[in-house]
């Protein structure tokens, strides 16, 4: 499959998720959940990929949160701006999403924890409000908690099913393409300009950097460590 065919296939999948899952929810209102979920997956996989650094003996998602010491968390947050525990990763939340009766509040707590992990650090201003438009308790998702959770689980599962490959340069391209595609299509269907969309500031930076062909230096600003070996690894 050529890169253009791969991109077209991915766009069809994403648009299907955006339309099939939302049900009666207005597409313009639902946009932040699709974009936010894609963003959540992106930062989770970026985070894990940096920690593992190609080492097959490390699987960050399978580590217990208890292995993260205050020193590791502090050092990582100082270095990379925020911290995310293994249990908070997209892959782990999605794995149990369908049977999780508190999914909406669990997601809200995770997003709040990611943002608050930067409190007191130089990155606080950049991280604050990162998930502000991803309101997991909004009635836009449904009138009951069950309805909200069902829709959130469907979005998580849909985004998890997207074939984005390993987290390398090509995947960064695909995430950027997905954002650009969704923004332009939502805007066109709502009769609005793309500039009216909320896009996480770091994704905006990502897309801008990608267009300037700066992939070799891109780290997205969201990385951490889960071992002394990772802590001592050079950063670029």
Which residues does each PLM region occupy?
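Non-catalytic, mostly N-terminal accessory regions of nucleic-acid modification and defense proteins
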Residues: 1-206, 210-211
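Conserved S-adenosyl-L-methionine
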Residues: 193-236
């Amino acid at each position: 499959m050529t890169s253009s065919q791969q991109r077209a296939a991915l766009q069809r999948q994403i648009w299907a998720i955006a339309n099939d899952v939302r049900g009666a929810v207005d597409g313009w209102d639902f946009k932040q959940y699709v974009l936010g979920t894609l963003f959540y997956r992106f930062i989770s996989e970026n985070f894990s990929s940096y920690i593992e650094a190609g080492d097959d003996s490390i699987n960050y998602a399978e580590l217990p949160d208890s292995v993260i010491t205050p020193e590791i968390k502090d050092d990582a947050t100082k270095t990379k701006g925020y911290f995310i525990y293994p249990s908070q990763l997209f892959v782990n939340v999605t794995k149990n999403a369908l049977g999780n009766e508190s999914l909406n509040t669990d997601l809200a707590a995770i997003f709040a924890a990611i943002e608050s992990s930067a409190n007191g650090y130089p990155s606080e201003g950049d991280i604050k409000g990162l998930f502000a438009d991803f309101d997991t308790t909004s009635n836009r998702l449904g009138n009951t908690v069950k309805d909200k959770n069902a829709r959130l689980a469907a979005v998580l599962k849909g985004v998890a099913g997207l074939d984005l490959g390993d987290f390398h340069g090509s995947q960064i391209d695909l995430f950027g393409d997905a954002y650009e595609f969704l923004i332009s299509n939502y805007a066109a269907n709502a009769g609005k300009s793309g500039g009216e969309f909320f896009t996480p500031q770091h994704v905006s930076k990502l897309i801008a950097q990608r267009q300037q062909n700066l992939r070799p230096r891109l780290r997205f600003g969201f990385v951490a460590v889960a071992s002394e070996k990772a802590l001592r690894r050079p950063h670029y």
